[in-house]
Amino acid sequence: MTDLTAQDAAWSTRDHLDDPVIGELRNRFGPDAFTVQATRTGIPVVWVKREQLLEVGDFLKKLPKPYVMLFDLHGMDERLRTHRDGLPAADFSVFYHLISIERNRDIMLKVALSENDLRVPTFTKLFPNANWYERETWEMFGIDIEGHPHLTRIMMPQTWEGHPLRKDYPARATEFDPFELTKAKQDLEMEALTFKPEDWGMKRGTDNEDFMFLNLGPNHPSAHGAFRIILQLDGEEIVDCVPDIGYHHRGAEKMGERQSWHSYIPYTDRIEYLGGCVNEMPYVLAVEKLAGITVPDRVNVIRVMLSELFRINSHLLYISTFIQDVGAMTPVFFAFTDRQKIYDLVEAITGFRMHPAWFRIGGVAHDLPRGWDRLLREFLEWMPKRLDSYEKAALRNTILKGRSQGVAAYGAKEALEWGTTGAGLRATGIDFDVRKWRPYSGYENFDFEVPVGGGVSDCYTRVMLKVEELRQSLRILQQCLDNMPEGPFKADHPLTTPPPKERTLQHIETLITHFLQVSWGPVMPAQESFQMVEATKGINSYYLTSDGSTMSYRTRVRTPSFAHLQQIPSAIRGSLVSDLIVYLGSIDFVMSDVDR
């Protein structure tokens, strides 16, 4: 325990005290207006009174270097949390995570709520993208959002009963009664899926004509998954639309409360099922912040290498399916040939293809195999020429450019308002890539550029930025090949999981530690941590709350695709149905990333 205590002290943070925004808030609202919470999130966490929430949010949004993006918003059931020293009394809480691009800093506002008075004012008056986040917060916790434009379920069926992320809500199927779909239940479910325009503030027609309401999905090839959009059409023109998500929801955050810190790693792969190890990175880094683990240089470079391989793999599928959505079939078959080479390389290193679950708390599952460098070198010799052929043969085609240039275009202001990240944000001219601005896993040691657009994000610009991102990922991989450090593939730390196997043969204490951490799970200090990464589709993050147990008290997964789909109506109104198909192809999303 002595080693753990020393490590714990080394990881104490002063971000909550040193950030200038704390002084700005105290100057405006008084020194005693807030409770500042010490965490390992790396950002200031400030508890505000419910009555001051909108005023504080408006103040932050209007600062000289403003907090212009609502990055995340969600809740927590605090009733069973035992380690709450120094925090306001709360049965539930709601948090608001804001980002300032100019400062390259974040702030998290928290509101404490009593079980007898579960309500907060809507944040949509300040940030329109709060809409979906508030709907999910109400759905999962039963917290009323006063003034919300349409407070209804978003992940679960409209007929669902209860609030799944409450601590008293069952987490296992065996805790429910057996499911029976009677004729009456089936009729009720079908009725719940019937779209009523009036519920969404839409008119069925004007004095001269009626609008047509069309279901696109949830089983449409251009919807890219189980995704439904209800279109209000005047001929071919889209007057308005309502995205309908949740068909792929699997309760990933609830699962985090029933799995050990170690056994949850495979679930992260399936949040965005094309991203593989990219999904594991923010979770493992957040857990390592809780544990106070610093990994060896070799681990950092291996993690970067696997992440960039999966980034290339995902981008190739995105680019080829976008071209297919526009009408060209051939490139998608070429792309699958190239992706197979990546899968061969990933399988040789990890033993798996799509979902390796290979990162570990404190390292990776095992060291690189013999011959990994030869396979990577062959891929790096192959891929650049293929990228040139994609660009020359398909992406510079005049028909494709005509279908995508100027379509679903938006500027920096709209991107920030809707929480857009990744290529969609950078296409507007905002240079914000987490690997550069907030480097993690040693990205600061790599030489690469961040492709940025000219001020307007349209379908064509978003795709072309991804092509250039592919080239930069190849550049990073070359540096991994040339500069792979020697050293261990796991950190020498008591909470590294699983511990090195060879130590079990030395002493009974190490054998007991190994047995407990593998079977029961490591016990993490009671703290909060946060990690964001530049994932394949935008910024992905994990916000973890530990109550000093073998399992997470609260696992919040923020995915980019959720924010990007909420933006669809704003970007596509006034366009044609054919433009919507191109727009959907240019977003780069998968529904598991949306629905979790």
Curated annotation (Swiss-Prot):
What membrane topology does the UniProt entry give? Peripheral membrane protein
**Pfam families recorded for this chain?**
Complex1_30kDa (PF00329), Complex1_49kDa (PF00346)
SUPFAM superfamilies per record: HydB/Nqo4-like, Nqo5-like
As recorded in UniProt, coiled-coil segments are none
Q: Name one GO cellular component term.
A: plasma membrane
* Metal-binding among keywords: no
Give start-end of the signal peptide. Answer: none
The ranges of region (NADH dehydrogenase I subunit D) come to: 210-596
Start and end residues of each stretch annotated as NADH dehydrogenase I subunit C: 2-186
Query: What Gene3D superfamilies is this protein classified in?
Result: Cytochrome-c3 Hydrogenase, chain B (1.10.645.10), NADH:ubiquinone oxidoreductase, 30kDa subunit (3.30.460.80)
Q: What is its EC number?
A: 7.1.1.-
Would I find Transcription among this entry's keywords?
Answer: no
UniProt similarity note = In the N-terminal section; belongs to the complex I 30 kDa subunit family. In the C-terminal section; belongs to the complex I 49 kDa subunit family.
Q: What quaternary arrangement does the UniProt entry report?
A: NDH-1 is composed of 13 different subunits. Subunits NuoB, CD, E, F, and G constitute the peripheral sector of the complex.
Protein purpose: NDH-1 shuttles electrons from NADH, via FMN and iron-sulfur (Fe-S) centers, to quinones in the respiratory chain. The immediate electron acceptor for the enzyme in this species is believed to be ubiquinone. Couples the redox reaction to proton translocation (for every two electrons transferred, four hydrogen ions are translocated across the cytoplasmic membrane), and thus conserves the redox energy in a proton gradient.
Protein known as: NADH-quinone oxidoreductase subunit C/D
